[in-house]
Amino acid sequence: MKDYKKMLKDLEQQEKELVFSEFTNETALNIGLIIIENAKKDNKKITINIEKNKQQIFHYAFDGTSPDNDDWITRKNRVVNRFYNSSLYIGILLKDEKKSIEEMYHISSFEYCPYGGAFPIIMKDVGVVGVITVSGLTEEEDHNMVVSAIREYLNNINSYK
């Protein structure tokens, strides 16, 4: 049996650590390219989407993906934009409470998808300004693909300071 409480604490910690001092369209491009390179290395077929202030500023779909991946992205993004947490966090919270998104929040699972892969773009002293999303793998793999790219990007820029 999974320890949902520990998973929630770990996800909360990720959201505290993975914070940007700025997030520009160039930032989105760089993170998107990191995700592409990591997916190529692992031979993964995914769709990537990055939005800032609800404007799409990066999108890439590997061969072998479909419009279904875009639909998953839209539904995962709605979760982040509503709750200001990663879609995986909300999914784990629901599992811990043993409730569906309909039961707990009275919203449609056709519109809101509480599965991993969408991670909030969190700006220091501002809060959530967007979302980085991957679709095409398991929910944990989608989530980890985004988190590892953000971590790599932040580590790279912090090493130059």
Curated annotation (Swiss-Prot):
It comes from the Bacteria. InterPro entries: PduO/GlcC-like, PduO/GlcC-like_sf, YBR137W-like. HAMAP family: UPF0303. Belongs to the UPF0303 family. This is UPF0303 protein CTC_00911.
